[in-house]
A protein has these predicted regions:
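Flexible, low-complexity linker/boundary loops enriched in proline and small hydrophobic residues
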Residues: 2-42, 155, 164-169
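Hydrophobic beta-strand-centered segment that forms part of the acyl-chain substrate-binding groove
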Residues: 2, 9-18, 86-124, 148-150, ...
Length: 169
């Protein structure tokens, strides 16, 4: 059984763009193939709500190899798109002590229906825990009125230190 809706997807006005791709780039560091958001269409600072969408294209890098006869948006990219949505919210509202929000983990994630080229994936997130060390967002994804994905995204603040090389873990 699907979870209770964070927000009814039919109530989200997709024509009311709060941030287009260029505005998203000013906040989120992902580029090229890993830019997973097309637009942000809702931000509510009082309820810690955000909604945005990804227009799934037929020429994306994964289409050729992820089930060539029946291309499906990989679940990991759905999760990445949701994480980018949450990161945009945290950074643009100034709730983060860092340069960007890094992927901290996933909990309770379920995929309920496929997402295919030509679909518009609407993502809705609600911040349920936000502090200096960690954020947790409940997220849901829809194609039309169909819930295709839900789960919890954990984020951690990261600082870019351009003069230090990456360290092995």
């Amino acid at each position: 059984m699907p979870p209770t809706l964070i927000v009814d997807p039919a109530s989200v006005d997709l024509s009311q763009v709060v941030a287009d791709r260029e505005a998203i780039r000013r906040v989120n560091p992902q580029r090229y193939e890993l830019e997973q958001l097309t637009a942000i269409v809702l931000m509510d600072g009082e309820q810690h709500l955000i909604a945005g969408y990804k227009d799934v294209g037929a020429e994306e890098f994964w289409v050729r190899g992820h089930l060539p006869d029946y291309p499906l948006l990989p679940g990991v990219l759905i999760c990445e798109a949701a994480a980018q949505l949450c990161s945009y919210y945290i950074v643009s509202t100034g709730l983060l002590q860092g340069d960007f929000l890094g992927f901290g983990g996933l909990e309770n994630v379920r995929f309920r229906s496929p997402v295919r080229p030509g679909d518009r994936l609407l993502l809705i997130g609600k911040g349920t825990r936000m502090n200096r060390r960690q954020t947790i967002f409940n997220v849901q994804g829809f194609v039309g009125a169909t819930m295709v994905f839900h789960g919890d995204i954990l984020g951690v603040p990261l600082h870019r230190q351009e003069d230090e090389p990456a360290q092995e873990v």
